[in-house]
UniProtKB/Swiss-Prot annotation:
Pfam families: CSN5_C, JAB. A motif (JAMM motif) lies at residues 136-149. GO terms for cellular component: COP9 signalosome; cytoplasm; cytosol; nucleus; perinuclear region of cytoplasm; synaptic vesicle. Zn(2+) binds at residues 136, 138, 149. The CSN complex is associated with some 'Lys-63'-specific deubiquitination. Such activity is however not mediated by the core CSN complex but by the brcc3/brcc36 component of the BRISC complex. Signal peptide: none annotated. Keywords: Cytoplasm, Cytoplasmic vesicle, Hydrolase, Metal-binding, Metalloprotease, Nucleus, Protease, Signalosome, Synapse, Zinc. InterPro entries: CSN5_C (IPR040961), JAMM/MPN+_dom (IPR000555), JAMM_MPN+_peptidase_M67A (IPR050242), MPN (IPR037518). Probable protease subunit of the COP9 signalosome complex (CSN), a complex involved in various cellular and developmental processes. The CSN complex is an essential regulator of the ubiquitin (Ubl) conjugation pathway by mediating the deneddylation of the cullin subunits of E3 ligase complexes, leading to modify the Ubl ligase activity. In the complex, it probably acts as the catalytic center that mediates the cleavage of nedd8 from cullins. It however has no metalloprotease activity by itself and requires the other subunits of the CSN complex. This is COP9 signalosome complex subunit 5.
Length: 334
């Protein structure tokens, strides 16, 4: 159990988990206040109104476990929570019985019935929070919204405001050790957002870049943080024991073997593209813009290469440590 506690503490530190001191404030549900916010609808006056998203450690762990259970298939779930000013607070989450593929999730009638029954039963046991968003996984290709995701989120924001979309990459979570997660809200149709600075760089596979580029200006990311309290510590410990055993008994080198191979192939294609563009650029004089674009692609490919290498080394180090802990036989006595 000591090892489990250390692993849990490491996970909390890796994801910058904050312990809430004023427990009653964040866990108390003020129905009147929430109704006043819903009536005022401040997000209709400012399309960039919500800026922050807070997730409870319990909701986060449930989402990560669900996403990991799907493997290479996308999974989907719903989140319960409330609004506090410009912050969307996610208190809990639950999985939905949906059909998933490697590129999308499809919610059928049974999923909507399950959703309604779950929320109703949650209220009967004192969980008064409403549905505040949905989550789904992007196994191996990062946290962003595809064209289908943008359409789904736009529809949700049209009829179920306030609503947020959360994307988790379980494959990169296993590789990096830190939860790879993003929270997003879409802009209304026809709205042109102001030019923003460059967002944090993330590796996008070559076959997804077009989908990413076409829709990247139709939504924005919220600043994500995580919190916990002594109230949910016991539940978190019980849930962690299952998560920790799965993590300890698995190897990212084996679990993510296909992902790593795909990363290497994707990287080789990006390098070939960059090399071809640089080659063409050498025959064209005075086209500095073309050269800069080629060099930019080469720089991104270099960053992707470093990331893949670090993740592979991280997985190898984990295997060596586990081998030393569990498989080494003391031969000095022989």
């Amino acid at each position: 159990m000591a090892g489990s506690s250390i692993a849990m503490k490491t996970w909390e530190l890796s994801n910058s988990m904050q312990e809430v001191q004023s427990i009653d404030e964040i866990y108390k549900y003020d129905k009147k206040q929430q109704q006043e916010i819903l009536a005022a609808k401040p997000w209709t006056k400012d399309h960039h109104y919500f800026k922050y998203c807070k997730l409870s450690a319990l909701a986060l762990l449930k989402m990560v476990m669900h996403a990991r259970s799907g493997g290479n298939l996308e999974v989907m779930g719903l989140m319960l929570g409330k609004v506090d000013g410009e912050t969307m607070i996610i208190m809990d989450s639950f999985a939905l019985p949906v059909e998933g593929t490697e590129t999308r999730v499809n919610a059928q009638a049974a999923a909507y019935e399950y959703m309604a029954a779950y929320i109703e039963n949650a209220k009967q046991v004192g969980r008064l929070e409403n549905a505040i968003g949905w989550y789904h996984s992007h196994p191996g290709y990062g946290c962003w919204l595809s064209g289908i995701d943008v359409s789904t989120q736009m529809l949700n924001q049209q009829f179920q405001e306030p609503f947020v979309a959360v994307v988790i990459d379980p494959t990169r979570t296993i590789s990096a050790g830190k939860v790879n997660l993003g929270a997003f809200r879409t802009y209304p149709k026809g709205y042109k957002p102001p030019d923003e600075g460059p967002s944090e760089y993330q590796t996008i596979p070559l076959n997804k870049i077009e989908d990413f580029g076409v829709h990247c200006k139709q939504y924005y990311a919220l600043e994500v943080s995580y919190f916990k309290s002594s109230l949910d510590r016991k539940l978190l410990e019980l849930l962690w024991n299952k998560y920790w055993v799965n993590t300890l008994s698995s190897s990212s080198l084996l679990t993510n073997a296909d992902y790593t191979t795909g990363q290497v192939f994707d990287l080789s294609e990006k390098l070939e593209q960059a090399e071809a563009q640089l080659g063409r650029g050498s025959f064209m004089l005075g086209l500095d813009t073309h050269d800069r674009k080629s060099e930019d692609k080469l720089a991104k490919a270099t960053r992707d290469s470093c990331k893949t290498t670090i993740e592979a080394i991280h997985g190898l180090m984990s295997q060596v440590i586990k081998d030393k802990l569990f498989n080494q036989v003391n031969t000095s006595a022989n």
